[in-house]
Amino acid sequence: MRFIVISLICCSHLLAGVDKDFEQAAGNGRLANEGFVRCRNFVTGWLAHADPNTGLIPRNLSQDKNIWNAQDSAADNNPFMVLTAAITDRPLFEGRMLDMLKTEAKLTSRIGNLPDTYSFSKQRFQSDQPDLARIIFGSAEYAKDGLLPLTEYLGKSP
């Protein structure tokens, strides 16, 4: 009988700690959910501004909303959209986001696979002549800030 009483006292102490752990986990879950919702809203918001002809997203929503470029559109924005879709909306990732990547490669590759700035209104490169320094800079930014994080998380590209 004494063993049962001691066991109950010990177990009640352990269960009190478990309740706190579950409360902490529930709070963390709510915060994670809020983060996922905000990231998903970010993707939805940017997709609403995609160029209707190409599906590509603009450099920004003010003075450069008419262009796509490697160092900003591709390097700083698109990877987070792709990762968010991969985590929160697999059909979006496997559909529109991969289509965007294919279109990007098709329309923006200027020197081999190295991309150059694309004009939505011209439906061609922004500059008539390639600028090697700009192309290398944009490509390096895209590789470093965009493609590397995607590859680290997603693995080999399709």
Role assignments for model-derived ranges:
Residues L8-A16:
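Hydrophobic h-region of N-terminal signal peptides that target proteins for export
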Residues M1-S7:
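Sec-dependent signal peptide recognition
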Residues G17-P158:
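Glycan-recognition and catalytic cores of secretory/periplasmic carbohydrate-active enzymes
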